[in-house]
Structure formats: C-alpha cells, structure tokens
C-alpha cells in the first residue's frame, strides 16, 4: 500500500522533531493498517527543497520518530521510485512492515505533478491511501498522480482515518452546525481569508476578527493604525465586508501596542482609536479579550483559525491565549470546537488546552480552502471516502 502522509514537521537545529502532531495524528491509520497485515510504503514531503536532495530537509528524523511510536523498524529508503533497488526492497517487505521514502520533493516533478513520477510511485503499491490532509489542496505527483496511476490499473484510492476525520469536522462545522455558531479569524492578512469570510458570513451567528488582519478593517473604519501592518489594497474590500456583515462581525475595541514588536517591548493598552503614529498593534486588549471570550464561551460550534496577536512574544500573547482558554471552556461545556491548523494549533498547544478541544486540523492552507468551498485535488482523486463518496 502506498500511503501519502503529511510529515512536514518542524525540526530543531539538531534535527529533532519539535512538534510531532502531524506524525502522531497518523498513528491510528498506521496501527489499523499494520493490524490488517498491510505492507506500507509511506510518502511525504518536508520543507521546500527545489527538486534535489538537501540534507536539512531529510525525513530521517521522522523515520526515527515513527520507529519509536510504532515500536518497530521504519527504514528510510533513499533510492528513487522506478529504480530497481527500491522495487526490490519493496518486494521484500513482509506483512505489517513500514518503510518511509526519502523526501519526495527531493525529486524533480513532484510539485508539477509529473506523470512519470506519479506512475513510478503508483507502481509501488496496489492500493493508494491518502492521509495527507495538509497537502490535499495541492495537485502533486505523490498524491494526485500516484492515486490516478493506481486507479488506472484497477486499484482503489482510499482515505485514511485522519483524512476522514479532518473532512468530517471541517465540513460539519459549516454544513450543519449546532448554534450559536461562532467563527474566530486572525493572523496577518485579510487577503488570504477573504474567500473564507465570504463563505462563512451567511453561515455564522458571529464572526470575530482579530490579529493583524483586523488592522485593515480598522483602516476601513477610518481609524489610525500607526505603523501597524495594513493591506492598503484590501481596505475597500474590508469596508464592503463590514457593510454586508453589520453587527454579525465583531472587531477588537482595544489593542496592545508598542513601538517595536519584540520580547522586551514596552507595551501599553489603548482603545482602537488611540494608536499612536509610531506604534504597532501586537495584540487585542483586555476588554476585547473578555468580549471575544464571552462570545466563544456561548457558542455551541466554534471554528478558530489564526492568532489574535504575536503570541510567540510574551507581551502580545494574552489575547490569543484568552481565546484558546475560552474555546476549551466551551468544549468542556459540550460545544464542538475546530481549530484550523497552522499558528492556531501551535497556540492551542502553547496555551495548554489542545487536549480539551474537539479537533485540531493538521492542515492550515487545506482547511482554509475547504472552508472557502474550494475543491481539494488530493481529496477529489479518492474514490472511497467514508460516506461522502468519490468526486471523480
């Protein structure tokens, strides 16, 4: 079985996996397959190598972590798909064996969905399993190309347990949510989330906007944002969204500002119309934290994507952590909470509430695409997907 995973994990300078969530999230799939006697060839990328080997992007640390988690040998195979050496190694596998191919982006043609590479990968397995939700919004050789190659030979292309879980929670969050349905959007730029806002506005009972993307909305309201990041070419769009959303869209009423955004910043809290000329907005203020937290605690379904500030820096972390704690409290009270991957997932871990939330997505970009109503090539190519059916 050829299994496309998303092991694009952060590594320390010493080469250790610093956040194992993407590896650990695939363990239920791997345990299930091994118990069934499958011979599993794992495929993944890590980082953005340019079609040739770069040691800093090797999947060797992932192979070591998988071996620890599975309590089994997980060799890293460096021979390329289509080579006699790799074919012979795969043919020698026994039931329950797991191997990991070296970073698929070390090969030219992966990101271009090269048909020859897809065919070479497809010849390694009789079944394709897609469990890389984090890469599902890309049409690459290792997901779309390999799946099609196996399907063309009459083999199935199926979703893994992680893929099914991701799609179930993200689709249900929008399609038939328990109400009140509250969405919290943050992060740096409105441009990457306009389609998500457009898709969510008719569905949500309340849309909360924080983080640096709120600055562009402030500018649309005619407020000074000092030296803060603002997408000038999106101010008019922000104004249109504010007009359409009315009272449904909630912005911060106060901000934590400083002249520099660093760990030693001398910060102060001001109302949103009190940002000084040389000041930068780094977080939402205490009043906004309570306002947002009250909305989140009252939700029955809550979707969160994007931090409220520069949470990696202590002077600007409390807004994000306040939202994370409120989300955990809502979940404890029976709400469904879905965190849309990326920085918000890291923030949930940093706030020590990750275990209390319903679902933390492993795919930042893919989750946004799905919430915006876009098709995901890595999902569309699968012909067995729980009760959703195939898309081809």
Language-model features: locations:
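Active-site loop-to-helix "anion-binding N-cap" substructures in soluble metabolic enzymes
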Residues: 1-392
